[in-house]
């Protein structure tokens, strides 16, 4: 996991524990004051939200406890985890830049490519100038590696 990914997940965990959890506990207490819990929609909604928050806290704690933080700036060579890669779509001539990251921090819209994705798996081990073929739901796509950076 990159340092930025670790920090983002750690920040989310802190927010859940210090802001979200206390807020939902207050919501449950307020809903209880309204009387009969069997037909109290506010109470049931707050309990459901509490369950989600507690589940996410456990999930984040597990991810962070097992995370190995890697500094991409200390890496070099061919494409590997942490690399920032610019590729050229050979069909559309469109360039895209992605950083190859772990599952927990992946966000394709932000240019953070899951290392387990077909595109990332095809890129691993390649160098600038190499071409790759990736099977997509729309058929095979060809890409050329334009640049590889470790930042």
From Swiss-Prot:
Pfam families: GreA_GreB (PF01272), GreA_GreB_N (PF03449). It comes from Cereibacter sphaeroides (strain ATCC 17023 / DSM 158 / JCM 6121 / CCUG 31486 / LMG 2827 / NBRC 12203 / NCIMB 8253 / ATH 2.4.1.). InterPro entries: GreA/GreB_C_sf (IPR036953), TF_GreA/GreB_CS (IPR018151), Tscrpt_elong_fac_GreA (IPR006359), Tscrpt_elong_fac_GreA/B (IPR028624), Tscrpt_elong_fac_GreA/B_C (IPR001437), Tscrpt_elong_fac_GreA/B_fam (IPR023459), Tscrpt_elong_fac_GreA/B_N (IPR022691), Tscrpt_elong_fac_GreA/B_N_sf (IPR036805). This is Transcription elongation factor GreA. Necessary for efficient RNA polymerase transcription elongation past template-encoded arresting sites. The arresting sites in DNA have the property of trapping a certain fraction of elongating RNA polymerases that pass through, resulting in locked ternary complexes. Cleavage of the nascent transcript by cleavage factors such as GreA or GreB allows the resumption of elongation from the new 3'terminus. GreA releases sequences of 2 to 3 nucleotides. One of its GO terms (biological process) is DNA-templated transcription elongation. It comes from the Bacteria. The keyword DNA-binding applies. The gene is greA. NCBIfam families: greA, PRK00226.1-2, PRK00226.1-4, PRK00226.1-5. Keywords: Coiled coil, DNA-binding, Transcription, Transcription regulation. Gene3D superfamilies: Transcription elongation factor, GreA/GreB, C-terminal domain, Transcription elongation factor, GreA/GreB, N-terminal domain. Belongs to the GreA/GreB family. One of its GO terms (molecular function) is RNA polymerase binding. HAMAP family: GreA_GreB. Residues 41-62 form a coiled coil.
